[in-house]
């Protein structure tokens, strides 16, 4: 046991919202430069405490320390990025086409927000939501996942030390997610909900948010295709596949989930990919030699093994791995499956683990059809030496983010988000702050006639 926390009640959630509402007016009027400086100090503090955050995340959810350190750097970057974006949230002033009246457009904070974060990236998902909300002038209630509440507590403490006023960020940790979101979504004072998690839960939150027509940002499930064309550099494709599949042990919504490889190079790619996967070391996240940590719980391990077993029963071949690791802990062998039938269940849902199913295609149009054969549309990865082909395919596949010869594409400066059932809205980039503002238009009579 790492620690014990009080489980927040519905009353605690409402009290947190009341604190956010009380702070909203003064926070919205705080100068953008002041908000920017708070975010920049928070970046410096999180970076200085990198080892503390990394160890805490490893202890909470098992990821290797190297992965955790990478998350700290990635998560901190949202604080720095939005510290710089805070003063660039421009409106505009223009003359009407008729030339008489004037148009003034300004951006205002949307108001108190509910931010719900997942367990797989407990720091980065918090900073990716909190930073733009702070930049826009919004107050917040942050609900971290019940499996990883400690990281958010440390982050909130760090934000306070950076100078964030009381009431702007209110963390409510609870074993009952609905006990927090339920009463808040019924309260008309809440003006936005931002959620990262599963599509079914996101749909329920959107339904509840419709009661008061709340602004919503939904970063939901993914089923990313990793497409390798016959003209790709296979060594670089394998390197990218390892990054896209094994970041965070595969417990990421952007993780490559379906490896679509052109028939003429499928055997060579699969052989090299399996060799790289099989060479990974599995162990406790605190062991410096570990490259793959445990899954989040026993249920996750059992679900993954059921998908692998069903695929093998349907004709797939486990080239490497294919079973839980013997001994204590929720470990699963890094696995590559070849000859996976296109109708296999493992190709149709998020795996959220270290398993890579490989299937083949014949033509470019076949690859596009297979890539789009999913209700999800978050991330996709394309490997080819032909840039025109990459552009053609990217324009025809239904995904919010596409990597060209790159296995990791997330960046604070880029708009993160998907289409179809992968969600609504964008986090990061210049688009990120817009998710927390509302647009007000002011019509001004002709100043030369008044």
UniProtKB/Swiss-Prot annotation:
Q: Which residues form the signal peptide?
A: none
Instruction: State the EC number(s).
Output: 1.2.1.16
Binding, NADP(+): 119-120, 143-146, 197-198, 220, 350
Cysteine pairs bridged by disulfides in the record = none
Q: What induces it?
A: Is transcribed only in the presence of nicotine.
The family database entries (Pfam families) matched by this protein are listed as:
Aldedh (PF00171)
The keyword tRNA-binding is assigned to this record: no
Assembly behavior: Homodimer.
Functional summary from the UniProt entry = Catalyzes the NAD(P)(+)-dependent oxidation of succinate semialdehyde to succinate, which may enter the citric acid cycle. Is involved in the catabolism of 4-methylaminobutanoate produced from nicotine. Acts preferentially with NADP(+) as cosubstrate but can also use NAD(+). To a lesser extent, is active also towards butyraldehyde (8.5% of the activity observed with succinate semialdehyde) and propionaldehyde (1.6% of the activity observed with succinate semialdehyde) as substrates.
- Protein name, per record: Succinate-semialdehyde dehydrogenase
The protein's gene is named: sad
């Amino acid at each position: 046991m790492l620690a014990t926390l009080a489980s927040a009640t519905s009353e605690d959630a409402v009290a947190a919202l009341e604190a956010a509402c009380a702070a909203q007016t003064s926070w919205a009027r705080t100068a953008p430069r002041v908000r920017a400086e708070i975010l920049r100090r928070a970046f410096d503090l999180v970076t200085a405490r990198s080892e503390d955050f990394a160890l805490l995340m490893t202890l909470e959810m098992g990821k290797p320390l190297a992965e955790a350190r990478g998350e700290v750097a990635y998560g901190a970057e949202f604080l720095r990025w939005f510290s710089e974006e805070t003063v660039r949230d421009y409106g505009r002033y223009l003359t009407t086409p008729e030339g008489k009246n004037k148009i003034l457009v300004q951006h205002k904070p949307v108001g108190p927000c509910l931010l719900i974060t997942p367990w797989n990236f407990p720091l980065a998902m918090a900073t990716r939501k909190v930073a733009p909300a702070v930049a826009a002038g919004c107050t917040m209630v942050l609900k971290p996942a019940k499996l990883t509440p400690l990281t958010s507590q440390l982050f909130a403490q760090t934000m306070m030390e950076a100078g964030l006023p009381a009431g702007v960020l209110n963390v409510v940790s609870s074993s009952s997610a609905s006990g927090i979101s339920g009463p808040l979504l019924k309260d008309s004072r809440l003006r936005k909900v931002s959620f990262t998690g599963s599509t079914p839960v996101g749909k329920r939150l959107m339904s509840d948010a419709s009661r008061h027509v709340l602004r919503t940002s939904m970063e939901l499930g993914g089923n990313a295709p990793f497409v390798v064309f016959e003209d790709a550099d296979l060594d670089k494709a394998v390197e990218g596949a390892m990054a896209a599949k094994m970041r965070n042990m595969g417990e990421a919504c952007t993780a490559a989930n379906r490896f679509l490889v052109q028939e003429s190079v499928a055997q060579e790619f699969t052989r090299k990919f399996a060799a790289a996967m099989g060479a990974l070391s599995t162990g406790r996240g605190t062991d410096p030699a570990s490259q793959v940590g445990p899954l989040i719980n026993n249920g996750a391990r059992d679900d993954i093994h059921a998908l692998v077993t069903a695929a093998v029963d349907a004709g797939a071949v486990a080239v490497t791995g294919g079973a839980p690791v013997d001994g204590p802990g929720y470990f699963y062998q890094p696995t590559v499956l070849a000859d996976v039938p296109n109708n296999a269940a493992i190709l149709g849902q998020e795996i959220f683990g270290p398993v890579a199913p490989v299937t083949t295609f014949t033509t470019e149009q076949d690859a596009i059809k297979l890539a789009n054969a999913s209700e999800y549309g978050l991330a996709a990865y394309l490997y080819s030496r032909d840039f025109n082909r990459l552009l053609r395919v990217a324009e025809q596949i239904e995904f919010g983010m596409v990597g060209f010869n790159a296995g990791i594409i997330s960046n604070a400066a880029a708009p993160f988000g998907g289409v179809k059932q992968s969600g609504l809205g964008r986090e990061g980039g210049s688009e990120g702050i817009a998710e927390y503002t509302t647009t007000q238009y002011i019509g001004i009579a002709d100043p030369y006639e008044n």
